[in-house]
Amino acid sequence: MENILAMVRDFGLFHLQWGQGIMILVGLVLLYLAIVKRFEPLLLVPIGFGGILSNLPDAGLAMSAIENAVYAAKPEVMTAFSEVLQLSSYMPADIKQALSSATPLQMTTLHLLAEQYQYSDGMLYLFYSIAIASGAGPLIIFMGVGAMTDFGPLLANPKTLLLGAAAQFGIFTTVLGALALSSLGVMDFSVAQAAAIGIIGGADGPTAIYVSSMLAPELLGAIAVAAYSYMALVPMIQPPIMRALTTQEERKIQMQQLRQVHKLEKIGFPLLLLILIALLLPSATPLLGMFCFGNLMRECGVVERLSDTAQNALINIVTIFLGLSVGSKLMADKFLQPQTIGILVLGIVAFCVGTAAGVLMAKLMNRFSTTKLNPLIGSAGVSAVPMAARVSNKVGLEANAQNFLLMHAMGPNVAGVIGSAVAAGVMIKYVMG
């Protein structure tokens, strides 16, 4: 009878905390949005499921061996940990606080101690360490995106590169906004955290994950969820801004058909882009290097098998583990913070400012050019590929049934991918030194 009662007391249900319950509901909401509403299902399904797994009571799937040991709080383990950390207190809360300032040697010793007491790293923690903490996951995704990208529309109309650059204004505006909130005492964001939040404005999930994992890993869950949620909401967020900033006549502008781009141009462009960026901004080289490599495999025509693997099987496999890894950061004690609200608000501001900046840049360019651009393609400067370009095309068709802007909008859309990677390099360079 005692054994049965002990087994019942060990049921996770009796150890469920209110925060974990809320985050399990958040995970279910993400799954609902992905499955029923089709909001970025490729990422939100694994993120939502990972969020549920990481909040299951007593499972410890998203915690390291050290964190699992502290959570269990066995007296003999806490005594050993406090000796390593040189603490007078054996309380788990004090030990947990001391871990944030522990030296690498102390962390290594604690990890070995935890393993000696039969504690191990959780499954999701291992996924995170391999896929995100190492930086490998987002970089492989970028290679796959490069293999799927056609630079033809950008090369056929190079001035659309300016639209992609203008849309990154949302990133830097949001960084300043986050710092302003901190200075006013509304929120408490460090410079590194502000930079990581700002990248949401690039509408590029892999870049947001890459930058936040380097600058503010504690905010990774909220930043990734915000980035992919707002990317899915591009068809709802952008059209009102586009219509507000353009006249009916501007939306009716029909653009000239793009010229045919020579294969040699497509092969040479990723090489030239990589060399140029590497010489000017080395910190952006990892992202753009993998992006350009993927694109070169696509365009060179001699490695079809590698190109096909990069843009299909490989990117799909990595997406699964990347999503689960992001889900591991949706633990209640890390996600249910006042900062999360600030991130969600700043993220939507970043999207809106980036969209508006692209449209306004197109209007400005029209003042100095005889060949008119339809300002609607400026909104595609955010790097939500190809959703933003499709939105530009849809709004254009509403104004003029003969106005097909999709291929024209792909130019600034692809430029936005380059722009967000460059912006990420700038953030990493000046925040990390």
UniProtKB/Swiss-Prot annotation:
Gene Ontology molecular function, alphabetical: decarboxylation-driven active transmembrane transporter activity; lyase activity
In short, the EC number is 7.2.4.2
Which reaction equation describes what this protein catalyses?
Answer: oxaloacetate + 2 Na(+)(in) + H(+) = pyruvate + 2 Na(+)(out) + CO2
Look up the signal peptide feature and give its range.
none
Required co-factor(s) are: Na(+)
Principal subcellular localization: membrane
Q: Which family does the similarity line name?
A: Belongs to the GcdB/MmdB/OadB family.
Please report the name of this protein according to its UniProt entry.
Answer: Probable oxaloacetate decarboxylase beta chain
UniProt source species: Vibrio cholerae serotype O1 (strain ATCC 39315 / El Tor Inaba N16961)
